[in-house]
């Protein structure tokens, strides 16, 4: 059990380094707004969840393409879904990123699902 916890902590550290140095920079350069990142504990699928707003589907697609290029350059698996809607999900290496239009974010209100999670960062 202790070994598993140590491995999980190391995984979070690796994600944090990759995450803070690269992923958030892409979101900011792509002018995504209201960015929140949560550290998710006791979840076998995600270690980090990021939620952000975009102004249009074009901005969403562009942001996802830039992230895909970054993630693939690190030889990581990348998955995206919902590119033609008001809510898209990107997944890679224990990180899930939800892109919302402002209206969709208010409607689905995912932020409240993570009220008990550690808020790692917030922009805007």
Where are these regions (language model features)?
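Polybasic/polar functional segments that serve as interface/processing modules
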Residues: 2-46, 55-88, 103, 114-124
């Amino acid at each position: 059990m202790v070994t598993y916890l140590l491995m999980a902590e190391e995984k979070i550290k690796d994600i944090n380094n990759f995450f803070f140095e690269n992923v958030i920079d892409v979101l900011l350069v792509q002018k995504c707004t209201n960015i929140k990142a949560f550290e998710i504990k006791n979840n076998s699928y995600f270690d980090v969840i990021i939620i952000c707003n975009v102004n249009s589907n074009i901005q969403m697609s562009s942001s996802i393409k830039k992230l895909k290029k970054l993630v693939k350059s690190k030889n990581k698996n990348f998955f995206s879904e919902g590119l033609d809607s008001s809510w898209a999900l990107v997944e890679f290496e224990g990180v899930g990123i939800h892109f919302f239009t402002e209206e969709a974010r208010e409607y689905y209100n995912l932020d409240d699902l993570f009220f008990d999670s550690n808020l790692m960062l917030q922009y805007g």
